Amino acid sequence: MRILVLEDDRVQQGRIEQTLLDIGRSRNLRLEIDIAKNYGDVEKYSQYFDNYQLYLLDLEIDGERERGFQVAQQVRERDPFTSIVFVSTHSEALPLAFRYHLSALDFISKDQSEEDYRHQLERCLDYVLAVSYTHLRAHETVLD
């Protein structure tokens, strides 16, 4: 599974990457994780938007509070069905996701316990795997 993380805080970058890698190891999953540290990095990775199955986006990037929503809009323009999860301390901004019509899979608060944080990430990975498997099976059925 290919994942793009948008996070500008180094501590949080390490936290999310390590948690994902731990989950991947415990479940024998092959995870390819790219980390965009700022909006400029997102532009660099945007040519590969079609290749990611999951986006984990912080809301506030480079001091701009809605930057994560703007990135999610760009992703949606290229792929209306991919999974987007917001990972942030700004839970009060979550209603804005509806204004942007982003169909986010989840919102993960950075302020929760490590156990809850990991559990939410696991549930998101499980969902993406299930959807990918369903699409693969549907594709195989069409080919048969």
Residues of each region from the PLM?
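Non-catalytic signal-transmission and effector/linker regions of two-component phosphorelay proteins
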Residues: 1-2
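Conserved acidic carboxylate
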Residues: 7
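Charged phosphotransfer/docking patches of two-component systems
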Residues: 10-17, 94
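Acidic, metal-coordinating helix/loop segments flanking the phosphotransfer/catalytic sites
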Residues: 17-18, 35-54
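Short hydrophobic/Thr-rich beta-strand motif most characteristic of the beta2 strand and flanking loop
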Residues: 25-39
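CheY-like receiver
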Residues: 52-129
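Single conserved hydrophobic/aromatic residue that forms the stacking wall/gate
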Residues: 135-144
